[in-house]
Regions:
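Noncatalytic linker/hinge segments flanking ATPase motor cores
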Residues: 1-3, 45-46, 116-121
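AAA+ ATPase "lid" subdomain C-terminal helix
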Residues: 1-25, 32-40, 61-73, 143-150, ...
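Short secondary-structure boundary segments
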Residues: 12-29, 88-97, 101-103
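Generic anion/oxyanion-binding catalytic loop in active/binding sites
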Residues: 16, 47, 125
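Short, conserved phosphate-binding/catalytic loop or strand-edge motifs used
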Residues: 28-33, 82-84
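Short pre-active-site segment immediately N-terminal to the catalytic Zn-binding motif
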Residues: 41-52
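Soluble catalytic regions of large protease machineries
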Residues: 51-55, 61-255
């Protein structure tokens, strides 16, 4: 159903723009609309809130760019979509069937990035990160109770009952003591605190880049992948690596 919705949205956009076929821009836009909701450009946002949202999304996107295991940023925007004040769109460069502990740790830091950025650079915290905190808590709990990625060791906690035909969890049977429940909560909190510390360290080290991102977001409202990579220095790093690789290959040929 989701795939059909994506194609339908892309087809509608293509027709509106006088195109006979669905092209990549329409497909990307339809993905954003279906996943995040329609743009709400008409929503009036104060200058103060706009700045907070810019720091929030700047925090998410910059941490995603700086941590090696996080998904690359495709787009960052402070235009409202659905219930969100702004959004950072990230996606893996290839299909993944397996996810590592390091991936989850970096993604936790990305999720905490909006909250940390608000706290560090606006001297306040808002209700904006509520969904991020919920997702971070779910991810950390899954690491502890489902994937054995914590100090409690390689085991699972809790038996889940599922509706087989719908693939949906309906309940969870508790197969551990209250003492273990406290240990699980403690591990979840530890993972989130460490992710918060990683986010804070990254933003402190890259403060100048964050300020550039915020300035660009306030001026343009949306930054696409190519411009984002230039702002944070990813493109330069990639080009330098390519130059070194070509140089090494050239030297090898001379030998």
């Amino acid at each position: 159903a989701d795939l059909a919705n994506l194609v339908n949205e892309a087809a509608i956009l293509s027709v509106r723009r006088g195109k006979k076929t669905i092209a990549e821009p329409e497909l990307k836009e339809s993905i954003e609309k279906v996943i995040l909701g329609p743009e709400r450009k008409s929503k009036v946002i104060s200058a103060k809130e706009k700045k907070i949202i810019a720091y929030h999304e700047g925090g998410h996107s910059l941490i995603s760019a700086m941590l090696p295991n996080a998904d690359p940023v495709q787009k960052v925007s402070i235009i409202s979509r659905g219930q969100a004040g702004g959004y950072t769109l990230s996606a893996p460069t290839e299909d993944k069937r397996l996810h590592s502990k390091n991936y989850f740790l970096d993604e936790l830091a990305v999720l905490m990035g909006g909250h940390v950025s608000e706290k560090m650079f606006t001297n306040d915290v808002t209700t904006g990160p509520s969904n991020d905190l919920e997702r971070a808590t779910r991810m950390a709990r899954a690491m502890v109770t489902r994937y054995g990625m914590s100090n409690l060791g390689p085991r699972t906690f809790g038996k889940k009952e599922e509706m087989v035909f719908l693939g949906r969890e309906i309940s969870e049977e508790k197969d551990y003591s209250e003492h273990t429940a406290e240990a699980i909560d403690s591990e979840v909190s530890r993972l989130i605190r460490e992710a918060e510390a990683t986010a804070e360290k990254t933003l402190k080290e890259k403060k100048d880049i964050l300020e550039k991102l915020v300035k660009e977001l306030l001026e343009k409202e949306t930054i696409e992948k190519e411009d984002f990579n230039k702002l944070v220095g990813i493109e330069i790093a990639q080009k330098n690596e390519e130059k070194i690789e070509r140089k090494i290959k050239g030297e090898e040929k001379l030998k």
